[in-house]
């Protein structure tokens, strides 16, 4: 049988498989393989017993509701609960904005880029960013432009942001995509004054801000949470994205967008085209969980669980770095970013990691440009056990030492 020739749309020509998911397919399944890679929650984080109890109530009270077609916007009760929490705990304006329940936060960003990005438009991001956002932007013919990240300021370079927008005389830049709280992959949180500055610059140039906040509830340090960029928004210039994946279960595929009402209406239209509505069973389950239990108590449990893991990883890195690595200490979230010293050969380092059965995420995978951060790698501390964290960091230290010894001297 001859091979059929398919004429695919030009918008998919430049897309590549998500490198994080591709890497997952090829991870060695050796018994002692330690994965410090994926942004997965711990299995200990899932409120299994509570969900089992309330599932009986959901089946009894809402069986026909979740088996039938549903509202695109999401079930009213869950949307109201989200609004109440955002208003009470984040001081966000829920009167001039509305909540759309999405099929995971990934769909949320897809919908936003779908309504704002035309072929040839530009979306600004941090230089190191979530790879899923990069693919979503490219899928609509958009160009991803990474802004320099100021590690000392824990923020994008706001001078570069201002200069970039001032130079955009054709108004091709449509959205600034940011993860300002516990950034992925770096782990830092943008300071309050930088958030205000970013908002002011984008408002002046009429560029939408997409504030992606999947980790925002997971603050482990004894500090006051930094206000969201959305909390400054009085003119409808910010779309705020939240998720249940990191605080309930990624299998729920529940996310949400808080968007200005005019934007909300367009998002609803696009979601009707995409999948009509998010999983109704999980919407009712999440809503019932919030009704029947203290959801803040559940989040506090997650903070305690993950703080111990983060502290263990930080302590292990501090003990085992041996002047070969430096790392960012986050206040929360899922990740720690590590930088290898320049005298370590990265190719050899990753080969040594593979031989030692340890998985990390290389920095170039998380780069907006797909390159340029070869000396960096990302570690996840939420999924592995404490023992795996300690052993994993020890193996990483050994790999770094081996790579340092083999690097050819510069002549």
Explain the meaning of each model-derived region:
Residues 13-104, 291, 359, 403, ...:
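N-terminal small-domain helix-loop-helix segment of the aminotransferase-like
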Residues 65-206, 210, 217-235, 306, ...:
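Conserved core of the PLP fold type I
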Residues 287, 303-314, 326-339:
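Conserved glycine-rich beta-strand-loop-beta hairpin in the small C-terminal domain of fold type I
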Residues 324-357:
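Conserved PLP-binding catalytic core of the aspartate aminotransferase-like
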